[in-house]
C-alpha cells in the first residue's frame, strides 16, 4: 500500500475523504466505479487504513443483517414485534453483498480474505424471553428476507447449533434459539485495505496517512480548502466535495466546517470491552454468531454476543461487548474530545439528553466498575463451562452516539445519520450501529444528496445498474428479485 509524501502531492482533487475507514473507502470505490477519471484524496491520522472502528477487534458487530440482533425488532405494546428496521438493515446488507460480488467479478476483491460464512443465532433464556423470540420468529420467517430462519427448543438440536453455549447448562433451564445458516463474518479492516489498494493501483486515489485536518473552510460555492498537517510538512488542498467519514472524529470536523446544519448535533461517547479467546480447541468448536438479549436500559452496542470472528485471518471468539463510558471520541483520541465538542448551539440538547437518559448514564458507569469476576460471571451465563484462563480482556472501539436538537428537545439516537451542507459540497456520517454492514446503502445516500446531478445522468444510472442489479428496486416487495440477488451473490462470493 502506497502512502503519499505530502510535499510532493497535488493541491486540487475532485473529492477529499477524511478518515480511511470502511465508509470513506466504500464511497471512494463507488465514485471510482461511476467515474474512473475522478481524482480522490483520502486523509488518515493513523499510520494505515482501517485501524479505528473498522478494525475487526474494534467493531461492535460484523456482518449485521438483522438475522439475530434482537434490538432491531423491539416488542410492541400489542405483543407483536416491529420488523421495519430489521428489513431495512437486511436489505442494506444484501446491497453490500451485491456490490462486493460485482467488484469480485471484476477481479478487484478476493472475498475469501475478508468474508466468511457463519450461522447467525438468537438465543434467549426464561419463559418471558422465549415468548418474545417465538413471536419474532413467527413474524420474520413469514417474510421472504428471513424465510430460512429456523426455530428450536430441542436441546440436542441446540447443542448442534452452539455446543459451547449448551455444555454444562442445567436441564431445567428454558432455552430457545433461532438460526439462519446464511450469515457472515466480515473483517471490515481488511476490506477497507482491499478497497484502498485497488484504488491506488488504478491511480485514482492518493492516500495520506499520519495526516490530520487542522482547518477546513469554504472558498466559495462548491469549493473547500483543507489545511493538512503531516510529519513531513503541511499543505493546503482544494476540492468541490468533502466527506467526513472519520468515525467519532467526524463530529468535531463537522463543527469546524461551520455549515449551519452542524449546529443541531452533539455526541455521546460509549466505550466497550471484549473477552477474547484464541484457544484453538474452543474456536474450532464454536462456529456461529450467537446474540442474546440486552439488559433493560443497555445501549445497542452492549447486546451480549458470542462471536466467531476472523481477525487478520486468524479465528477467535469474542464475547461482549461490556459497555462503559469514556470522554474520547476515538479509541486513539483525547479525553478532552467530549468537552471540546460542546457549543452554545448544542449545550442544552446535551443536558436534556443527560437528564432523559440518566438510567443509561448510570448503567454505563456501573459497567465501568465491573471486576474481572463480574465480567466472567456474565460470560458464564452464555458459556457455563468457560475457564477464566482461556479469555483475555481487550478494549473495543469507541462509538459516538448522536445527540440531536429537535422540536421536542435533545434526543439521543442510536443509529447513523448523514449530515450534509445545503449545496451538497460537504457530507458527514455521524453515529454508530449498524454502521459498516450498511456502508454501501449509506454511501449511496451521500451520493444522492451531494452528487444528485451526476446520479441522475444516464451514464451513472447505467453503471449503477451494472454494479447493483437491484438498484432502484425494493427486494422486500419483489421476492423473485431477492432470490436472484442472493443466487448471484452466493455464486460470486463463493458461499458454499
From Swiss-Prot:
Please give the superkingdom of this protein's source. Answer: Bacteria
Its needed co-factors are: FAD
The EC number(s) this enzyme carries: 1.1.5.4
Q: Which SUPFAM superfamilies match?
A: FAD/NAD(P)-binding domain (SSF51905)
Kindly tell me the pathway this chain contributes to: Carbohydrate metabolism; tricarboxylic acid cycle; oxaloacetate from (S)-malate (quinone route): step 1/1
* Keywords linked to the UniProt accession: FAD, Flavoprotein, Oxidoreductase, Tricarboxylic acid cycle
* Biological processes per GO annotation: tricarboxylic acid cycle
Per its UniProt record, what InterPro entries does this chain match?
Answer: FAD/NAD-bd_sf (IPR036188), MQO (IPR006231)
The main enzyme category here is oxidoreductase
- What does the record give as the reaction this protein catalyses? (S)-malate + a quinone = a quinol + oxaloacetate
Gene Ontology molecular function:
2-hydroxyglutarate dehydrogenase activity; L-malate dehydrogenase (quinone) activity
Q: Which family does it belong to?
A: Belongs to the MQO family.
Which PANTHER family does UniProt cross-reference here? L-2-HYDROXYGLUTARATE DEHYDROGENASE, MITOCHONDRIAL
Protein name as catalogued: Probable malate:quinone oxidoreductase
Amino acid at each position: 500500500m502506497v502512502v503519499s509524501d505530502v510535499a510532493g502531492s497535488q493541491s486540487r482533487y475532485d473529492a477529499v475523504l477524511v478518515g480511511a475507514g470502511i465508509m470513506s473507502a466504500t464511497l471512494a470505490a463507488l465514485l471510482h466505479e461511476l467515474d474512473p477519471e475522478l481524482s480522490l484524496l483520502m486523509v488518515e491520522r493513523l499510520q494505515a487504513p482501517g485501524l479505528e472502528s473498522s478494525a475487526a477487534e474494534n467493531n461492535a458487530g460484523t456482518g449485521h443483517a438483522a438475522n439475530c440482533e434482537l434490538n432491531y425488532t423491539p416488542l410492541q405494546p400489542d405483543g407483536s414485534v416491529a420488523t421495519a428496521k430489521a428489513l431495512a438493515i437486511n436489505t442494506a446488507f444484501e446491497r453490500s453483498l451485491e456490490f462486493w460480488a460485482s467488484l469480485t467479478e471484476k477481479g478487484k476483491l478476493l472475498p475469501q480474505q475478508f468474508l466468511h460464512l457463519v450461522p447467525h443465532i438468537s438465543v434467549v433464556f426464561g419463559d418471558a424471553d422465549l415468548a418474545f423470540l417465538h413471536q419474532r420468529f413467527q413474524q420474520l420467517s413469514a417474510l421472504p428476507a428471513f424465510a430460512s430462519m429456523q426455530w428450536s427448543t430441542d436441546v440436542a438440536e441446540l447443542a448442534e447449533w452452539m455446543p459451547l453455549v449448551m455444555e454444562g447448562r442445567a436441564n431445567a433451564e428454558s432455552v430457545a434459539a433461532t438460526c439462519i445458516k446464511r450469515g457472515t463474518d466480515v473483517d471490515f479492516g481488511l476490506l477497507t485495505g482491499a478497497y484502498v489498494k485497488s484504488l491506488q493501483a488504478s491511480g485514482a486515489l492518493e492516500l495520506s496517512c499520519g495526516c490530520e485536518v487542522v482547518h477546513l473552510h469554504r472558498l466559495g460555492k462548491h469549493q473547500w480548502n483543507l489545511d493538512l498537517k503531516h510529519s513531513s510538512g503541511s499543505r493546503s488542498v482544494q476540492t468541490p466535495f468533502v466527506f467526513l467519514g472519520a468515525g467519532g472524529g467526524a463530529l468535531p470536523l463537522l463543527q469546524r466546517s461551520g455549515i449551519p446544519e452542524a449546529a443541531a448535533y452533539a455526541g455521546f461517547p460509549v466505550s466497550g470491552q471484549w473477552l477474547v479467546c484464541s484457544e484453538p480447541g474452543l474456536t474450532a468448536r464454536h462456529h456461529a454468531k450467537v446474540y442474546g438479549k440486552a439488559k433493560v436500559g443497555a445501549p445497542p452496542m452492549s447486546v451480549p454476543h458470542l462471536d466467531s470472528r476472523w481477525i487478520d485471518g486468524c479465528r477467535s471468539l469474542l464475547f461482549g461487548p461490556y459497555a462503559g463510558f469514556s470522554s474520547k471520541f476515538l479509541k486513539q483520541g483525547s479525553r478532552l474530545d467530549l468537552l471540546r465538542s460542546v457549543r452554545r448551539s448544542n449545550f442544552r440538547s446535551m443536558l436534556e439528553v443527560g437528564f432523559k437518559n440518566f438510567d443509561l448514564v448510570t448503567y454505563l458507569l456501573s459497567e465501568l466498575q465491573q471486576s474481572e469476576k463480574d465480567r466472567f460471571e456474565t460470560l458464564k451465563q452464555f458459556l457455563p463451562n468457560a475457564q477464566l484462563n482461556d479469555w483475555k480482556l481487550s478494549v473495543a472501539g469507541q462509538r459516538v452516539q448522536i445527540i440531536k436538537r429537535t422540536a421536542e428537545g435533545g434526543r439521543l439516537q442510536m443509529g447513523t445519520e448523514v449530515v450534509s451542507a445545503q449545496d451538497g459540497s460537504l457530507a458527514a456520517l455521524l453515529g454508530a450501529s449498524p454502521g459498516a454492514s450498511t456502508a454501501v446503502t449509506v454511501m449511496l445516500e451521500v451520493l444522492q444528496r451531494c452528487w444528485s446531478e451526476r446520479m441522475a445522468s444516464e451514464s451513472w444510472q447505467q453503471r449503477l445498474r451494472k454494479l447493483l442489479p437491484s438498484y432502484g428496486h425494493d427486494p422486500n416487495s419483489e421476492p423473485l428479485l431477492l432470490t436472484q440477488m442472493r443466487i448471484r451473490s452466493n455464486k460470486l462470493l463463493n458461499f458454499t
